[in-house]
Amino acid sequence: MKKVKFLLLPVVMVMTFGCQKFFDVNPQGVASPTQLKSKAGVGALLVGAYSLLDGVGSGTTQWHASVDNWVFGGVASDDAVKGTDAGDQPEQSFIEQYNWVADNTHFRGKWQHSYDAIARCNEVILFATDPDVKDMTDAEKTQAVAEARFLRGHYHFEAKKMWGNVPYIDEKTYKPNDPTGVLVTNTADIWPKIEADFAFAAANLPATQAQKGRATRWAAKSYLGKALLFQKKWAAAKTELLDVYNNSGKSLVTSFHDNFRTATNNNRESIFEVQFSINDGTGGQNGGKGSTLNWPYTSTSPGRGCCGFYLPSHNLVNAYRTDATGLPLIGAVADGSQDTYNNVDVPNDQGLKFSDAWTLDNSQPVDPRLDWTVGRRGVTFLDWGKMPGSSWIRDQNYSGPFTGKKWMYYLSEENSTTHATDRRSVNNNFRLIRLSHVILWLAECEAELGNLAQAQTYVNLIRNRAKGSPVQDASVNTKVEPYATGTFATRGAAFAINAVRHEQRLEFAMEGHRFFDLVRWGIAEKVLNAYVAKESVSGRGWDGRTFTKRAYLVGKTFTAKNNLYPIPADEILNSQKDGKSVLTQNPGY
């Protein structure tokens, strides 16, 4: 544990809240512990704990702890490549190529941010339960603690899925004035304590909150269900998730794309949303700065010219291929090894200049979610016109022909959506948990429990929404249909599990989940080595054109140790007590 992280940090005092989102507030001064022993003080501490949800503000590099986990959950998976060019952010290249070492500063930044945030949560709990706080009712204190425990559960969850073997720090362990006293081993399983945080939050939070962005009962129950899901506790996870599905009042929005627009922030599908804001006096720091590198590389595109990172892979684009009946090209093996979608590539302009003649071949169908997720040449890009090709890509030969699209803003909304002096700072919230997550997690539970018909029902809810959503470009050949009655039961459990997993990929691509899903399913090594083997060689589109893919991936291998990231070397060094490190490194590093 990094010693300095557990010193009592100066805490921002926020005495009043205006019409801004409740944690988009400028620092107003430094408060003493005495001042914090009040309703306003506890509220300010809680704002501080919420404020780190976006991954920015703990002193680390912005993208090391971005809420969307685009490096650790996306670039490390088969969804995306690093992008940009070979020389930019080489530490990310090491992550992409599974060459992981404990002194990579990306790992330390994520660790530092996680435990800084946990410390803030513990401060809230300590002050909220202090008997010297006289101007809060017991109910108000309980709710403050419940919100802090929800956040503490989230931040520990983030650490757990990264490193597996991590210390759990609660308000009893936390000793800001005794850095060595807080040192805790990382050998115990912390899942029960994460569960306890979410369970307490679920029992003590209201179903709705007046201020958008605050945790609710349904957010806590959803997260508890997710924690149980990660442990393969299918029946227990189903209980929590089914309560959310049946009783939260949430429903799917009509258009898939409405989960990714500023105009539809905090919509009826959203269960827990990280709030972004702009023009609030912070210089754009509250505008999703963890993703500041992930914009097309030209001044005539969203973001206005930087920096070309986090680009969709050919494998991901091909995953959206469908057959003539609108169903995915997947097989009856749960690890996806019999899937055929990656046998032929979706036609693309890899290797061509934007000025070279090229026409998109639409002779085969794709799922319409593809063109709300990925920017590709010849297809309308929101209201920016047709994506022009390599002029939007920093180095197409290195990073490929596609660009991210899910979180991009409309040209017509640029002034209202972006910061006045930084077009890469936006007020488009990150939907951390939405009802579609809950539905597909329920589908996963049912498939694993053998209830295949019910699993199919849940999957079809998502596929029917995709079918009914507006298409991005009417000229594209799109086709998506629900599975026919009895398909899962007829084709068996392995097919059903694979279909659920594939649907999660299609629905949540480029949102930073894929790597962690592959790991928890126990198929990361097989899937990612197959991905590297195919993504590193020449491709061939169904139009017959051949092209070179990512040659730098040749010979790269994912091994069993890569299921967990290495614990930062500095954190192990700083955990020394009586000359011996308390933290233990993960196997293989």
Feature-to-residue mapping (PLM):
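Conserved, well-structured interaction surfaces
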Residues: 39, 43-47, 51-57, 83-163, ...
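Membrane-proximal, proline-rich intrinsically disordered regions
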Residues: 19-71, 579-589
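Bacterial Sec-dependent N-terminal signal peptides
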Residues: 1-27
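Long, intrinsically disordered, low-complexity segments
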Residues: 18-19, 73-76, 83-86, 114-117, ...
